[in-house]
Amino acid sequence: MKASMFLALAGLVLLFVVCYASESEEKEFPRELLSTIFAVDDFKGEERECLGIFKACTPGKNECCSNRVCSGKTRWSKWKL
């Protein structure tokens, strides 16, 4: 009887420890996710040196990415046709 009570108590303690560890990992997950998102956004800003589609541009300058041209009418970067 004492052995079964000891095993039941040890099982409850083990369950508590596992649940506590899982909960602490869940609390840190949003922070890690946000830091990863902001790190990727910073990297994207440094990587791109040309204007994407529908971005404001100046006609005559070569600001748009390849396969795109600055429209003189709308002053937006658009696909070359």
Swiss-Prot record:
Tissue distribution: Expressed by the venom gland.
Compartments, record wording: Secreted
Keywords noted in UniProt: Disulfide bond, Knottin, Neurotoxin, Postsynaptic neurotoxin, Secreted, Signal, Toxin
Signal peptide residues on this chain, from the entry's feature table: 1-21
Positions annotated as propeptide: 22-48
Recorded GO MF terms: ion channel inhibitor activity; toxin activity
SUPFAM superfamilies: omega toxin-like (SSF57059)
Disulfide pattern: 50-65, 57-70
One Pfam family this sequence matches: Toxin_12
UniProt similarity note: Belongs to the neurotoxin 10 (Hwtx-1) family. 51 (Hntx-8) subfamily.
Entry protein name: U6-theraphotoxin-Hs1a
